[in-house]
Structures are given as C-alpha cells and as structure tokens.
A protein has these predicted regions:
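Structural preference for solvent-exposed beta-strand-turn elements
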Residues: 8-209
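Short linear segments in intrinsically disordered or otherwise low-structure-confidence regions
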Residues: 2-5
Length: 209
C-alpha cells in the first residue's frame, strides 16, 4: 500500500489501482428494481436480550451472523429457548432463569453486556465475567454499571466477575449518562421495563436501534 501523491498520507492507495482525481456521476436515468434489506445486527442483539423477559418473542428478518448465533446460545444458557424458523428467530423466555453467563459465551459476543439488564430484571441477580478481565482505570462497562445502580442494583466484583443483586425489585430513577452510550441506553431501557415506577434517561443515545 502506498500514499497517493498530494494526499499527505491521509488517503492510502492500493498498488495496482488507478488513481482518480474525481468521480463524475451523470444522472437523469430513472432508478428501478428490487432491493432486499437485511436485518440490522445492532438492532437484533438488544431485542434478543430483551426477549429473555417473560413471553414469546418472534424476531423477523433476523440476520444470520455469528453474534446473533452467540446471543441465541447465551439465551439457551440462561434458560430460554431460541431457534430459527427461516429468516426469523423465535425466543421463549418462560421457565426458570439461570443467572450466570460463562466466560466463554461472554467472549464470543462483544456486546454481551447488554444481557445484564434483562437478567437482573427477570431474576433479581446476575453473575457474569468482566469483559476484558480485571482492568485498572475507567472501563466502558462502568457506564452500564453506574446506570443500573440508579435503578437499585448492588454491584460487586470478585476475581474478574460481576455480582449484581437487587434487594427487593428494580425501581425507576433518573439516569444521567456521561455521554450517549448506545449499549448503556439499551441496558437501562431493558431493565426499566420491569422496574417499579418511571425511569428517565438523560443524555440517551439517539441511534435508530
């Protein structure tokens, strides 16, 4: 790979590619045709986490991705049943809930922390491994933990694991995020669905999912 002349290193150019000074688009022709839009992973994963709550959830147009498969495996570990029917995923969150996610499953999906709010809301406690192990200093997960504490969750750390408990049940509260984190917003929304009272999230994320 080499840098195109005049770009000061900002835009690398692959060897063997023709350098273009500009891209000219001539319109005027009517566009037509059919395009199939696949489901978005960033929307599917928090929905799958929320489907751990009581009742059956059917997610149509669910993408066939490794993260989605990992999420279904986590649901199965937690006591839910999840299976594919064509392009849909059917999840039944009824029955007893296992409150622990093994470290192996946590590492398969980068955003697996989004399951924390759902587990606590359903079971009242959760034990999961810390993403990245015992790190020093501020961590991305701290946003999630601080937000859930505002809903009454008591959180402790034990040799790379998080122990999260609620004395009675989750309660509503005002959650102010230091910055609009998508994952923390999703976690609070899922947990607040079964909390008693109203929850307000300030500085919430505005992404479509």
């Amino acid at each position: 790979m080499e840098t195109a002349p005049g770009t000061r290193g900002a835009y690398p150019q692959m060897k063997g590619c023709v350098k273009m000074e500009k891209l000219k688009i001539c319109g005027g022709s009517r566009l037509s045709g059919t395009l199939r839009v696949h489901g978005a992973k960033n929307a599917a994963l928090p929905i799958l986490a929320a489907s751990l709550l009581p009742g059956e959830c059917v997610l149509h147009n669910c993408p066939r991705l490794t993260d989605v498969e990992a999420a279904c495996n986590i649901l199965a570990q937690l006591g839910a049943s999840a299976h594919r029917e064509g392009e849909s995923v059917v999840v039944s969150g009824g029955g007893d809930c296992c409150c622990c996610i093994p470290d192996e499953l946590m590492r398969r999906m980068r955003s697996s922390i989004v399951f924390l709010g759902a587990i606590i809301a359903k079971c009242g406690w959760a034990r999961i491994s810390l993403p990245g192990g015992c790190e020093l200093g501020p961590r991305p997960i701290d946003l999630h933990l601080a937000a859930l504490e505002r809903l009454g969750v008591e959180i402790g750390e034990d040799h790379g694991y998080l122990d999260c408990r609620v004395r009675d049940r989750l309660h509503g509260g005002i959650v102010t995020l230091p910055f609009p984190s998508v994952g923390a917003t999703e976690n609070v929304m899922i947990a607040a669905a079964l909390a008693e009272g109203e929850t307000v999230i300030r500085n919430a994320a505005r992404e479509p999912e």
